[in-house]
Amino acid sequence: MPPAGTSRVKKGRRSFSDIALIALFIFGLLVFLYPPLANFYNHQRQKAAVVSYEKAVSKLDTTQVERLLDEAEAYNDALVYEPGRLPVSQMDQYLRMLNFTGTSVMGTIQIPSLGVNLPIYHTTDEAVLQAGVGHIPGTSLPIGGVGTRSVLTGHRGLPSSKLFTDLDKLKPGDIFVIRTGNRELAYRVSDIVEVLPTEVGALQLEADRDLVTLVTCTPYGINTHRLLVTGERTELSAVGSIAADAVRVDPVLVAAFVAVPIFVVGLVVVLRRTRSVYAPRHMGKDSSHADEK
């Protein structure tokens, strides 16, 4: 009969092995679930920001909304257009533009073919780009108008939020919609190019066109270039009805929820097999000792 201490050591080793297996499975599950769950959480926050903005604007007096839009048009007319460069002395004025709700949200952008509906914020600070789409200072405010070009940028490839991850899937002819104040502006994709970060020539104004350019990093995960997707203003009536709150189910999120029970079942199976390895051997030893007695 083995000493009692030896038996306790073996049991302790088995317990440690079980705990290690459980910890390993839980860690793997958390690593697997983090991207889709974080993306789902951020999507809900972005959706809430869009809904909150639209509700707040709808409650404003029409005269107040028109006044803010008139101020934005005057700002665009006087703007020395230079993407990414705005004198510090002009920053306060810029931040006051399109401030309908007392927040930094100046509007929303919807890309129906990608299931994207995001708030647009002033500046391209990192905190902004983690939360939604940023407007590049020094470019036209996104209110439309011939001879203007608003440049909007978003992150691509964040594990916690999709944002502009699928921007490369847009094709010429696709539509995106900008909502700011009581204006709803549709743009049809006309140009898609890749440039170096320093090549800002592709972002210049065109006197007879009303343009919005969407910018993100490319190639995916390498980010040495910039993908520029430019849309030209089109009649909203030609686009048809677009629901602002259209629902799309992320297949990655579905896969994550399907994976949870699979992980749990796998954990149970492994633990049972681990215990079954020990059980027959110890039972055999116990019976042989009993026979000797």
Predicted regions and their residues:
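Alpha-helical transmembrane segments
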Residues: P261-S276
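Solvent-exposed, low-complexity, intrinsically disordered
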Residues: M1-A4, G284-K293
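Single-pass type I membrane protein transmembrane segment
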Residues: A256-V260
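Cationic-aromatic interfacial patches
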Residues: P2-G12
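Solvent-exposed, non-transmembrane regions of membrane-associated and secreted proteins
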Residues: K11-V254, A279-H289
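A general, composition-driven signal for non-globular sequence regions
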Residues: S7, N39, G266-L267
